[in-house]
């Protein structure tokens, strides 16, 4: 059970870091390409 909890925590932390990293890297890239998305 403890191992499962650790694995779940690692997966959640990985996704959170991935989301934050992607958001930070996409934030400046979206400003100039804002017209492209519209």
Swiss-Prot record:
Keywords: Membrane, Photosynthesis, Photosystem II, Reaction center, Thylakoid, Transmembrane, Transmembrane helix. It is a single-pass membrane protein. Its main location: membrane. GO terms for biological process: photosynthesis. It is found in: Cellular thylakoid membrane. The chain crosses the membrane at residues 4-24. It comes from the Bacteria. Belongs to the PsbI family. PANTHER family: PHOTOSYSTEM II REACTION CENTER PROTEIN I (PTHR35772:SF1). One of the components of the core complex of photosystem II (PSII), required for its stability and/or assembly. PSII is a light-driven water:plastoquinone oxidoreductase that uses light energy to abstract electrons from H(2)O, generating O(2) and a proton gradient subsequently used for ATP formation. It consists of a core antenna complex that captures photons, and an electron transfer chain that converts photonic excitation into a charge separation. This is Photosystem II reaction center protein I. It comes from Trichodesmium erythraeum (strain IMS101). The gene is psbI.
